[in-house]
Each structure stands twice: as structure tokens, then as C-alpha cells.
Amino acid sequence: MRKKIYFLLCLLTISLMSFGQANDPLVSNCVMNAGANARYLKDFRIQLGKATTQGEPRYKANMSLWKNTKYRFTLCNSEDSKGQLILNLKDDTDKIVASSFDQQTGKTYSFIDFLCNKSGIYQLNYDFAGGQQGSGVGVVSMIK
């Protein structure tokens, strides 16, 4: 009888502890903005102060992407951000293969779709336009 009570007590404790992190509303909204045909894979929370010099993006992360898979990179800013969150996606040769910022028009896109032509490790480079300070979220999804 004691073993059953102990087992039930352990089971109850584990089930109460198994709840994940509290939902971040910015992440939740950004996942919803990715679209109904997008399957969430990962998010990156970015918080940066004002840059002292312009140049290389200040937040870098690596991610493995698979050939013949279409990905959507969704970018969301918090309300108090001074600049717009931008993403440059680089392949293993350090070549930019996709960007949310069009240098010719100066337009920043809230998401970009990328069809991966070569499996490998890709570098996600995040920053805020003009080196401004801000916080935001980058969500990576797979398109069905």
C-alpha cells in the first residue's frame, strides 16, 4: 500500500513539474504571424543595445537546414524597439543567401521564405536596422 501511495505522490509531483516555460506573448504572436501552413521549429529572442559602430550583425546563431525544405523566418519587434529587426541568412561559405532587408529599396520585410538547396549549417545574423536598440523575436518555421 505504501508503494502505491509513494508512486502516486511521485506521479503527481512529476506531472505538476512537467509544465513548460511560461508563454511569452511576443513569441506566441510571432508564431501566429508565421501562418497556418507553417510548422514552428525554433525561436530566437534578441535584445540589443544601440550599436557603437555599424558593420557585422550583433546576434549570430547557427541552425541546421535540410535540402529541398522550405523555411519561413518571421521577425517580430517588441513595442519599445527603436529599430526594425532584420535577418541575414548565410551559408557555409559565408555568402548571404536570404535577407529580410532589401538594400536597393531600403524596405524591411517581416518574414522571408527560403527554399534550402543544400543541407548544412546556416548562420542566422540578427540586428536592428541602423544599429538601433531593441528587442524582438525571430521564429523559424518549416512550410508544409
Question: At which residue positions do the language-model features occur?
Answer:
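Noncatalytic modules at the cell exterior or secretory-pathway interfaces
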Residues: 114-132
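Edge beta-strands of jelly-roll/beta-sandwich modules across compartments, strongly enriched
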Residues: 130-143
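N-terminal signal peptide c-region/cleavage motif recognized by signal peptidases
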Residues: 13-17
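Non-catalytic extracellular/lumenal accessory regions of secreted precursors
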Residues: 21-59
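Short, surface-exposed beta-strand/strand-loop-strand elements in extracellular ectodomains
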Residues: 80-96
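Extracellular and analogous surface-interaction loops
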Residues: 59-69, 113-119, 143
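Extended, low-complexity, turn-rich repeat/linker tracts enriched in Gly/Pro/Ser/Thr and Asp/Glu
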Residues: 77-85, 130-133
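Hydrophobic beta-strand segments within beta-rich accessory/binding domains
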Residues: 60-78, 123-127
